[in-house]
């Protein structure tokens, strides 16, 4: 390296050349690699009081430089004839002191000046190949007072050395001051240590650390309770605190009694805390060791870079006490002592975690710098006093725990403020203090009982975080409150469904009528009635009717498999089944059936029912997935529901609001939607599934109906927000929940809808729908909290023994309060297992959710994951065990394992099974669909020869093979036969993530579901401008069926509408006339390319003789006034010329007419009777209609003559490629038939100009013309 060689040549005398330590090599490498100024620059700032001589100061520092080789060293990445980098010790280096008098400045200005200098000095950095790697600056701030800034490169020495250097400085300065000769013991150079390091047994050290870290595979970081981005930089903050003397003494005494060092005790305590933060019994963190091997004589006075970071592993065993852990940790530390010089990089490289092995470090300052300086001053009777020492070191870790001994232990948390926030660091401080106290007071405590929750934090969690009591009508039933509302606002709209609007008074009467019918047919108080319905007014009327009759309702979604419906009716012993009119064929019930018809309920039966109910009576039974293979019926009372929707902190619903029902009637969110509206005087809109799953239609409905409050499952929200983030802008409150939220999408919606109150909502069915809420008021990069308990609910994080856990420690989220359900129907064992006595309020109960969560310091909760195998799919809670149980009931399945995996950002179910070779995945899906709802049907099926097992004989789910992203080989794949089928196949492949699709594949049998269907609908709209309701895909689930339906739909539109709008909007309208194929859809590619530049309307060929008049009327309907811009391609150019003449005769202004490769038609031509190959690519059902339109167009065009003149400007785009046999040169262009004329040479042959490869290039020409039209420029020359 030339620079290194030049440096060598400038050195007159070299004392020594030797290799670098591993840590020095790393710093050298990164200093050249990163190049940012200030890297590895360490700074110390301290105050010097006394009469200071600059000359004596400089002489003292120069003496230190002369004494220690390391201060005269430069570092070269390459030295000729030597391998590897080297440190070169010069015989002499001259030191220059920088000094400045700022005593004239006010104190605040002095401080600011010094801070600016520090930063500037740090940014200056060092050139390792030539600089003296140490700078010292003195600032006089007052008489006999200076501030010293001492900067050095970390490659020279570690922080442990600074105390040695400062001690020597005080001794040397005192000698000069006293005029006495210097008497310091000689020191050994740093090269002595490098020699020792080179000769040690590295393989033996590596083997030790490999054994020490064996089987450690999961990182154990200090949790980051912060949502700050870490990419900005490293902004260091420090939290420094002391342990009082009694606690410090007790810790020292405990360590001594158990025969361990204080460092070992503190490391053990920290390790146990880290275990609880990570829910594990095995953690690793880093510890900084001095790195000074005792076998080197005089090593304690050497100056250089000795420190090293080693891993500390704290692994605890069942029933182990803290005392036993201490003894084992001390033993391990002694065993590790000979190997503490092994480079951390080498240790990490041999582990599975590599750089993730260590997340943070602990540093023990066994002899603090301040104490060394003080001792030195006392010993020498120095004229100078040094205090207020500040050492600025920055490790590569985001958190450092530094412990300094003394009468009171001083602890410093040095952390990156871009990663950890101050509130969480303060919380750790309190918990660490409590943990140390617990260890000192109870060293024989079992680790399993070790807690660092102090009384203050317990009070904070139990009282402050759960201060949720509000007044609400807890002694009223749902019907009490509904009747109050109906009397208060009888004419206010209660329900809206399509064109039907039902007032509170009407709803009250209709539900009275149905309730009376129930009673007349034998329904009694406290019995259960099933309601089989879809989204409809009938469902809402039926719910109120059952409650008025004193019973509990069982919601049964019409889409549930009949077997599941039958099971629920049987287990609940339902006495009656109310069936929505039109769904009678779905009802398989031996009891009494009542048909519910919102239109047909007679008012003569609407006399109120006077059956008294209690708030503790059941309101409904709702089923969730069960681990035993059968679903669980959750029993919800009237009070549960009332507490959810009345006077609660998460909602301000009133009579001015309009809610909308989006969830399945068997999904618990419908409870909030129904009663949140009707018990607060609001209106409830009920929409069909098709509208809800079509983003444009759903967004339009929200705006047109001024919907104010909406709940969406996370999965549905994600799909809708991806299409249009601003579709919720008319709402004032949006609740999203069911699964973890996407921060990116939530951020996007928040920005697109600035007036929207956007909530993350959480809650299990067993706690009546909602338990916690969090309003998102800023952007999030990481997990969005689930918030705080709703009113009259409580939340606790408990361990497996039911004990309260501290802030930041994950545990089971348990919820209490007035929303807790009665339990599970007919499942006493399961009820007792998860509905437990309240740990703090005698006589009350909590529900153990099975969810893992933790408290954040601000009182919000953060959801982490499920504890058990329960999962969430599209907002619905499922038990894999239930699916597995059903699979094992099926013929051909011997073993089955169901798992959840993330694929393309979506949670998907995978089934691995041992079973029949003959049955296909489609067969198994079909069998499962008969007994389970669609969201519980796995998308991916993998047949295995045998299940992988764990050591204890259980299925090893982590070892199940991940299937390749391709379907199994099939015998009869039918490929697309026409363009529409081909486009549909491409969209399906994209949405389903598969490579091969047959046009007879059922979308829902090969991994599709309602939300993926929504993606297909959106993609069709976006790519092809084809807008279809989602019902189309449910009714026509194969590509062949859907393609035929689309052709028929387009053909019907062509026959009825004559024009199709092909893109969203643009600065001006462009009316396009079709080629001989006869359909305006031909211009779809052009429309996509011109979107937002021009609104493209494609005309179809009109077969009636009044076509010209109809075209003119269509255009004036769309655009009442001119000027108009027309485009005609091929035969459409001739047709459009006739239309332009007719418009001008009517006095309409046609400013411009773009003709794409059509020539003036001056004589009739024979009709082309040749075979039309395109007919073969059309679906059979529409082939004849399409070809008929084309033949009629051919006949019209063959006889058409373009005569006369138009005032409009003509822009003629001619094909760039002409067949040699076309006779092109004899055709007449349009110069003599218009006002202004311009000509352009296009791209491609005639048939390719507006499709495929050349469409974009020719669209650019058209766009250029449109822009010039807009700016009223007329091109008068041929281009």
From Swiss-Prot:
Gene3D superfamilies assigned to the protein according to its UniProt record, in alphabetical order: 3.30.300.30, 3.40.50.980, ACP-like, alpha/beta hydrolase, Chloramphenicol acetyltransferase-like domain, Helix hairpin bin, Luciferase, Domain 3, Nonribosomal peptide synthetase, condensation domain
Region of interest (Domain (isoleucine-activating)), ranges: 14-1047
Transferase is among the record's keywords: yes
EC number: 2.3.1.-
Region called Adenylation, residue ranges: 503-898
PROSITE patterns: AMP_BINDING (PS00455), CARRIER (PS50075), PHOSPHOPANTETHEINE (PS00012)
Cofactor annotation comment: Binds 1 phosphopantetheine covalently.
Cofactor(s) demanded: pantetheine 4'-phosphate
GO molecular function: phosphopantetheine binding; transferase activity
Origin superkingdom: Bacteria
Leading EC class: transferase
Sequence segments annotated as region (Thioesterase): 1068-1273
Chain positions found as O-(pantetheine 4'-phosphoryl)serine: 1010
Residue ranges of domain Carrier in the record: 975-1050
Keyword Mitochondrion included in the entry's annotation: no
GO biological process, any: amino acid activation for nonribosomal peptide biosynthetic process
Keywords: Antibiotic biosynthesis, Multifunctional enzyme, Phosphopantetheine, Phosphoprotein, Transferase
Family: Belongs to the ATP-dependent AMP-binding enzyme family.
Record's function text: This protein is a multifunctional enzyme, able to activate and polymerize the amino acid Ile as part of the biosynthesis of the lipopeptide antibiotic plipastatin. The activation sites for this amino acid consist of individual domains.
Protein name per its UniProtKB record: Plipastatin synthase subunit E
Native source species: Bacillus subtilis (strain 168)
Classification lineage: Bacteria, Bacillati, Bacillota, Bacilli, Bacillales
